[in-house]
């Protein structure tokens, strides 16, 4: 499934605060960029979730966020779909599911004309913060943030965000930077990179400490 992304849809994202214009796709021949170094707490890819299972919810304890996860694909122009409301997030279903080997991506809005979106404070996460993704199988895939970066949309590193780097990663993506009132959109994207640190049955998740 990663080949679909690499070959046809290495994109900058069009998550908007108030507008609807989308940045152009990155050409498929674009030079891959180096992925961030994995966290020292990351687990080996052999411990990744073995079978694909769609994510059903995302929890970010540091931000007091717990939200259902929908499914997103591609628009007709090759850009990535975005959630229909500011309080929703969506998993890019043409990539791996969270916990599998590869880079899973979940997108959400930073805000709207009505106020903050679900990822309004995403940029404030720091390395070591935890992300928990509950899968349809009942498994909870647990991730630790490794880095947070902001990219101008024209320089969005799609291969780095969407491509497989041999580990089980989860990227969260939203808008950020300067808001352009003429176009009605933000000029940058915020990306939170995280690595898988473990899995647990959903029923046992509340018994597992999220922070050391």
Predicted segments with their positions:
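N-terminal export and membrane-targeting signals
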Residues: 1-5
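Solvent-exposed, non-transmembrane regions of membrane-associated and secreted proteins
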Residues: 9-212
């Amino acid at each position: 499934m990663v080949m679909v992304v690499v070959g046809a849809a290495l994109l900058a994202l069009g998550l908007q605060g108030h507008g609807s214009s989308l940045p152009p796709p990155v050409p498929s021949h674009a030079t891959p960029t180096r992925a961030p170094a994995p966290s020292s707490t990351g687990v080996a890819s052999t411990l990744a979730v073995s079978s694909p299972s769609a994510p059903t919810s995302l929890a970010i304890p540091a931000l007091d966020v717990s939200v259902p996860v929908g499914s997103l694909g591609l628009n007709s122009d090759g850009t990535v779909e975005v959630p229909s409301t500011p309080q929703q997030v969506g998993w890019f279903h043409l990539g791996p599911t969270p916990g599998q080997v590869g880079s899973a991506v979940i997108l959400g809005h930073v805000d709207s004309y009505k106020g903050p979106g679900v990822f309004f404070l995403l940029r404030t996460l720091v390395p070591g913060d935890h992300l928990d993704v509950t899968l349809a199988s009942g498994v909870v895939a647990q991730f630790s943030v490794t880095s947070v970066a902001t990219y101008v949309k024209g320089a969005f590193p799609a291969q780095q965000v969407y491509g497989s780097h041999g580990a089980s990663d989860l990227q969260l993506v939203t808008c950020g930077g300067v808001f352009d009132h003429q176009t009605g959109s933000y000029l940058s994207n915020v990306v939170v990179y995280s690595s898988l640190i473990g899995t647990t049955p959903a029923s046992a998740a509340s018994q597992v400490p999220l922070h050391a």
